[in-house]
Amino acid sequence: VLLVPVLLSVLKLPTKTALATSQMVMAATTVVAMVLHARAGRVVFRTGVLFGLSGMAGSFLGGRLAHYISPSVLLSGFVVLMLASAIQMLRGSRKKTAPKSGAAWWLGMLVGFPTGLVAGMLGAGGGFLVVPALTIFGGLAMEQAVGTSLLVIAMQAFAGSLGYLGHSTVDFRLVGMLASVMAVGSLGGAVLSQRVPAAFLRRLFAALLIAVAIQMLVQTFF
């Protein structure tokens, strides 16, 4: 989520180029994280592919529709997504969602489409939407939902970036460099998460999201 503000503020990329670049980088780095979860047995591929396919359709359409939406509207939507992610992190996992037996696959796939649409349009992963959908409609335990969501997000990000490529220019060398740096960073983050309390990390990241969201709003409208 924080990659887009960096691309906008530090690298000064145009809004739609930043969103397209973010999706490509996310597709690559999420695959790396997904492989680690898969080796630990936390990825249910059948469920992930079913959700991911409907999400890909929505994400590709979202990427195409972004061509007709003004950058300020897209940034406003991205800010809302950041704030929603921050709220979800602050809430934590107070309520454990019990996986449903006989989960409604068809309903889950229907949910995947609008989730992908929003993610593809705004250049974000939408993990805070995917994980609950996998637990409620996919019948997965929380640990499996988190791992499987990485597969869904990777599929959505790939499709969304293809949708953006029809109307946005992307520097593939920059994508490769950012993906490499973030892949290494994710490994460091995994080590850090084992040494620092999860609740503290959630609050810290949520505060960072809120601060960056406010900064983006100020830059966009003032």
Describe each model-derived feature in a short phrase:
Residues 2-10, 15-16, 35-121, 136-137, ...:
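Juxtamembrane transmembrane-helix boundary motif
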Residues 21-36:
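Transmembrane alpha-helices of multi-pass small-molecule transport proteins
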Residues 22-26, 52, 149-153, 174-175, ...:
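Short hydrophobic/aromatic, small-residue-rich stretches within specific transmembrane helices
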Residues 133:
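Helix-turn-helix DNA-binding module
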